[in-house]
Structures are given as C-alpha cells and as structure tokens.
C-alpha cells in the first residue's frame, strides 16, 4: 500500500482510558478498495461493517469517506464499546449499532434486511481500554477481579471457571490457546490457589511457577491470553466470522482483518489461502486435477510502519490481512468442480 499516512491520531472517547487505533489509515483504505486515502479519495456508497467497533477509531475515519446514503453497521460484545457506538449513532444516521458478536454477523444483518455488504473490517483481540481497566480482569499489571469476559452481561468469568476446572483441562487450555510450553507446571500452581479473586495474585502465582521467561515479556502474558481466548471462544468466533464473509461480501467487496498473535493470524492466512488458490491437491485417481472456485483474490499482509510502532508500541505485533471477494458465487457443496 502506498502513500498511506505513517501514524494515526489519538482517537477520542468518553472513556478515561486512551486508545491508539492500530493500522488506522491502512485498514480504512483497504476496506474501501483504495490504495491510499487523501483529499481526492471519492465518497463511497454501499453498506460496510466494522465487526469490532471498540472505541470507534476505524469507524470514525471510514465515515469520512462514505456518502450520505451509505450505511455502517458496527458490532461489539463489550457494553462499554456499545455505549460509545450509541453516542456516535446519535450523531450520524449512517451508523447502525449491533450489540452482538461478529460470529452472529449474518443473522444480525439478515434480520435488518441486509444480505450483502461492500466491505468488512475487524480488529481482533483485546483493546487498550480493556487492558488498561483493571476491573475488566484482562491485565496482569493492574489489580481487579479475574473476569476477562468481552461481554460482561453474559457468560462465565475466568475466576469462576478456575474454581471448577480440573488441572489437566487448564493445562490444555494454557497450551492450546496461549502456546505456553510450561502449561502443566503453571496449571498445577494455579489449582493450588485457595481463591481466585485478584488478577495480580494470579499473575504472581504464574510468575513463581514459570521456570524461564523471555526478557522484556511478563511470564503471565501467554497464560492470561489463553484464558481470555478460551472464555470468550475467540478462535471459534473468528472461524465463524471468516466463513460468513464468503456469503456476506458482494462481488469485489473488501475484507480487512487485524490480528495480534500467531493463533489469530494463522487462521486468517490459511482461510484466505484456501479460498484464493482455486485448486484442490492433485488426485491420481481422477482423470484431471479438480478445480475449487476462487472466492478471494489479491490476499496480502500489511505491517505497521516504523513510525506507528514508535508512537504506539502495542502495534508492534499487529498484522493486517486484506483480500478482495471475487465474482464467484459461494458454493456450499464441497465436492470438486471440474474445468
């Protein structure tokens, strides 16, 4: 992507916690199908989706490039994010707020009379305000209840789950969702706790149980990530979200997804590869190689600029993957298509 501004302005919200929107200009340009954003960028008609509104940084910039007749559906599970989204919707009639997971995107849009959209963007994982607010339980640097739910109005907090989960299952969660090599040892230490009420106490137990950790990285990082991903079914939701993009995106519609760790990025990469290569592996028992329809084209990965990483250190691990929906109607029949 060329001629994209190298840093993002600080987004504003009524929250006391600041939030730097990652890959702001790159993401909005990608979801519009533009190489860059400038004064000559045309206003776009159509229907767009911000699948993870957060504090609205991407949505607010996108609205500057949408026509008066365009629509922007914004999704989020977090009630605090929805409060910010409702404030934006009160000011801009183009914004429609949906308090739900992007895993239910198709159902939510269909119920509002929308069957296809022109662009979908998502910024995966936990946001800076969520991390910075100790009461949410995401942070191992600030004390609070061990909650970690994206949607605090439903579901089970991590602290309650830890009271009943067995040691083996906990170890599997730490390994599978946090890629924690010392998962067995850490799980044993966690299950030795008498209560699960403080994130700082939990982080300290993990630290004491961790025999070796990477310099500059808190030893509880991967364990907290694992428990958060598990309790919110984040990977399952991502898989559902990506699958729905096949049917929701109109021909030449744009998909733009930001991820922050390998478990997320690997899923997005494999999904786009699978649906953009257009051919099954060769089978010697078939008379000719079978063809799979190509549902996406031009997949690419974009990293934050050095300037952005300097301004916002949390962007250092971010990757933006973008792709264009082809004109091929989605075929739900998995059988090969012969050319």
From Swiss-Prot:
PANTHER family, per database record: 12S RRNA N4-METHYLCYTIDINE METHYLTRANSFERASE, S-ADENOSYL-METHYLTRANSFERASE MRAW
EC code: 2.1.1.199
Gene3D superfamilies: Putative methyltransferase TM0872, insert domain, Vaccinia Virus protein VP39
GO CC annotation terms, alphabetical: cytoplasm
Keyword DNA damage listed: no
Highest taxon of the lineage: Bacteria
Coiled-coil stretches: none
Protein name: Ribosomal RNA small subunit methyltransferase H
Originating species: Psychrobacter sp. (strain PRwf-1)
Family: Belongs to the methyltransferase superfamily. RsmH family.
Keywords linked to the UniProt accession: Cytoplasm, Methyltransferase, rRNA processing, S-adenosyl-L-methionine, Transferase
Keyword Cell wall biogenesis/degradation: no
SUPFAM superfamilies according to UniProt: Putative methyltransferase TM0872, insert domain (SSF81799), S-adenosyl-L-methionine-dependent methyltransferases (SSF53335)
Pfam families assigned to the protein according to its UniProt record, in alphabetical order: Methyltransf_5
NCBIfam families: 16S rRNA (cytosine(1402)-N(4))-methyltransferase RsmH
Transmembrane segments: none
One function term, GO molecular function aspect: rRNA (cytosine-N4-)-methyltransferase activity
